């Protein structure tokens, strides 16, 4: 009886891990487990475009038509159609950060009125709730994130520091 129970538990675990791999979430260039958990919880502060936040974390950005967004630095990809917005993180420690989006959009990171070069990006269209993740080296000065080209009015966004071994620092709202 006990052996059957253990066998059943193992089968469920194998099936669950297979489902995650099948839906594409396990196929990003780096792990997005923390973002999956955060986005799956569904509780986010709604942030209007042009808002300032005190620090990194996860939030839901309420976008507006791109034509109405006033970008600090001209977008690298132009002013695509769709929706966009900007948000400034007022205090952020220096380091490598992973910024993950729930939907398709472009993103620019800006510090000291200059675009921060993107170090890496990965995207998938087969991971429910997560579309893309990018990494930047950030200085310890305010960080403005510019978004555009989204076809949805609300975008879940996480800004999490990457640890030295490229794991994500733990963050809870």
Map each language-model feature to its residues:
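Bacterial Sec-dependent signal peptides at the C-terminal "C-region" and cleavage site
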Residues: 16-22
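Bacterial N-terminal signal peptides
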Residues: 7-15
